[in-house]
């Protein structure tokens, strides 16, 4: 069974964290790609995904952001229960799940997977993201322009071709 792709919005905890840490992350020269507060097993995780407009994000960049963000979270204590803080890059093939992701990735090559095969017989399509709205994305492939409704998709990710 597949999950229908839906645009995600920050939950109240995630929004509170985003608002709190955004100035610190920005002052260090990074962007917040995503904030996820999620439970896995018995543990809660606060995952901060950072990006850069000028370069790829390295483990050193994540370390550079972790200390001041951790200090700020310890000082303000916005989450009552204990959690594990993780700061990482969204990766080369980052998930596009928020409105800001689709805005930032207009003109980028993406990979979209559907529940069923598309017209070309494949369940995946790679194309340039040329437009999007709350209901669908528009991809330009070498052969055609396709409008794909979110309700027919399981995911959309940045596409990177590994050699």
What are these regions (language model features)?
Residues 1-126, 130-163:
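Short Lys/Arg-rich amphipathic alpha-helical segments
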